[in-house]
């Protein structure tokens, strides 16, 4: 068991409650809705580093209904909490989402499996180039990656210590992303929303 897996296995319930209180789901859903992503009834989506399912739930809250979303995380307990949320949420059915325990650096999927990949606050736990390369591998050509990294800030400095991760500079994110993706857009969440205190968003298209 890795340190990251052990950490999130221990705090899954508390982490989920914190995310509900600070409104992350609504913030992500609002932006995803504005993107008008090319998600069709036969599309496959991956939420890489899904945690307790916040971004997956935001996707469905935004009105998207792909054929299937795979919610992948290294933490079994986080996936258990996520599965319970998927069961209880009115906008998601059991057939919509499949929780998968796995490692971001060795995704258990074939090359070019997904039309859209979402990842939020997960690449901070792995070497950035390796993580982006693996996400690019499973994404179809011209597919979309919605990348929500931690951005350098006072809040993220505190979170680095609390959650034992490494914040990548935005310059590093742009440079490394450019090896595999075209940067289509960069969204700054409003500072009035808690997600804006520590996160930003890049919209990327696989080359």
Where are these regions (language model features)?
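Short conserved loop adjoining the S-adenosyl-L-methionine
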Residues: 106-111
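A short glycine-rich, Lys/Arg-flanked "PGG" loop and its adjoining helix->strand segment in the class I
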Residues: 129-141
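Conserved SAM-binding loop and adjacent beta-strand
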Residues: 14-31
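A conserved beta-strand element that flanks and buttresses the S-adenosyl-L-methionine
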Residues: 118
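Conserved beta-strand signature within the Rossmann-like core of class I S-adenosyl-L-methionine
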Residues: 143-149
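N-terminal, positively charged/glycine-rich alpha-helical extensions of SAM-dependent methyltransferases
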Residues: 1-14
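Class I SAM-dependent methyltransferase SAM/SAH-binding core
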Residues: 46, 52-105
